[in-house]
Amino acid sequence: MAVKEVRFTSDARDRMLRGVDIMANAVRVTLGPKGRNVVIDKSFGAPRITKDGVSVAKEIELEDKFENMGAQMLREVASRTSDIAGDGTTTATVLAQAIVREGAKAVAAGMNPMDLKRGIDLAVEAIVRELRTNARKVSKNAEIAQVATISANGDAEIGRYLAEAMEKVGNEGVITVEEAKTAEIELEVVEGMQFDRGYLSPYFITNQEKMRVELEDAYILLHEKKLSNLQAMIPILESVIQSGKPLLIIAEDVEGEALATLVVNKLRGGLKIAAVKAPGFGDRRKSMLEDIAILTGGTVISEELGTKLESATIDILGRAKRVMVEKETTTIVDGAGSKADIGGRVAQIKAQIEDTTSDYDREKLQERLAKLAGGVAVIRVGGSTEIEVKEKKDRVDDALHATRAAVEEGILPGGGVALLRVVSVLNGLATANDDQRVGIEIVRRAIEAPVRQIAENAGAEGSIIVGKLREKEDFAFGWNAQTGEFGDLFQMGVIDPAKVVRAALQDAASVAGLLVTTEAMIAEKPKKDGQPQMPPAPGMDF
């Protein structure tokens, strides 16, 4: 067992705080419309330029083990916010740093860390309730465009295209982002479908950065039953390998020998392949497999239809221009099915919706109809160089997540102002003791941090901006960092999704509370550099 190094109390917290500061200071420069870029060196290819907080956080690894622990816990804040809301990672990091700093001071002054954490939790619960109460529902296309523009770092073109995409496929519709071969941004709505099933093995992943499988011009095998024996699949697999195209298998399940062999084939580079479970259950699964078959121009291999896997040829496989399989979803874009067949299937489902008396069945039929008829909006992002395309694609991804979050939970005034406006809810909050009251005050001071940082990144004095905002009690009154003007942020189009603000605060407080209550840290002791020199061989005098 490796030798461990242990740090206690203030020594542990100081080392950890240094790591938190290094991480947060690298991320915080990206906050707001006038935030700066961060350049990340990659082991291969050109450096990456980004303004995405979580992308910066994921790249930071510190040499000192104890500092690195602090940095990695702060990275967890950004990652969790990104997973929940898809945006707001920089805000969450700035909030977490502020809470940790204030908390460390309070602990050093002799406050009880557990009571501080309880006070922090009470304050966050109260603020989240108030944020939800004050959130305004998104109803207009213009508001969706404004949210997307803010999240895309003030790029109105990205905001316009995202709003247009949502208008075409609906707020719940599927929108994918790809790299374009031109220098412009393009929007196209293609026949496509998404269902809630992910890859059966992470070894199928082809894009490690996005953690997903991407198959271009793929064949699709649709099977009604479980696949556990590989023998029956060999003829069809050989045909696909000869064609040189990738293959997506959709079946009730793929397990045992069949899954293991597919993974081995993928790893050895012989076959670009992925396997997913078929969506739905029972009769609904059969119907959804048939929907996919019609969309892709394939045939479902089913005993009821008299088709067997052993005798199947490549002609019964479906085709799609692009397939993306993530951990929990599969998206099929531009299937090879004929428009007439798809139209006939849509008409059939509409007739079933009219005939059914069950609300549950009607809801499920409407879901199928939306998947089949809604299509997939593809936003193609272009640029002059590969670096520019990747940077712009990051911003489009952020904007897409932000707009979805806005539709889900509503919008609030942007620029960090919403948190400042709800701080009054902390005034009458009951606590069990004075240390919990200090925890509440820590949150009261920390929620100024995003406004201060946005102001500093825009070249203004954070304290002056916060002071002017406090002079007015109007909920929507704030400072537009892009123009340097004060006014109604809703009218100016400076808005944040409520879900993003909420998730940023909750995740920041959660991890910061754990850091504040840390009393000891254990890490592996670094090995000493250099090997002992060998003694000179006999007869070798130097």
Curated annotation (Swiss-Prot):
ATP binds at T30, L31, G32, P33, K51, D87, G88, T89, T90, T91, G415, D496. It is found in: Cytoplasm. Together with its co-chaperonin GroES, plays an essential role in assisting protein folding. The GroEL-GroES system forms a nano-cage that allows encapsulation of the non-native substrate proteins and provides a physical environment optimized to promote and accelerate protein folding. It comes from Sinorhizobium medicae (strain WSM419). One of its GO terms (biological process) is protein refolding. Gene3D superfamilies: GroEL (3.50.7.10), GroEL-like equatorial domain (1.10.560.10), TCP-1-like chaperonin intermediate domain (3.30.260.10). This is Chaperonin GroEL 2. It comes from the Bacteria. It is an enzyme of class 5 (isomerase). Forms a cylinder of 14 subunits composed of two heptameric rings stacked back-to-back. Interacts with the co-chaperonin GroES. Its EC number is 5.6.1.7. InterPro entries: Chaperonin_Cpn60_CS (IPR018370), Cpn60/GroEL (IPR001844), Cpn60/GroEL/TCP-1 (IPR002423), GroEL-like_apical_dom_sf (IPR027409), GROEL-like_equatorial_sf (IPR027413), TCP-1-like_intermed_sf (IPR027410). NCBIfam families: GroEL (TIGR02348), PRK00013.1 (NF000592), PRK12849.1 (NF009487), PRK12850.1 (NF009488), PRK12851.1 (NF009489). Residues 523-542 are annotated as: Disordered. Residues 533-542 have a biased composition (Pro residues).
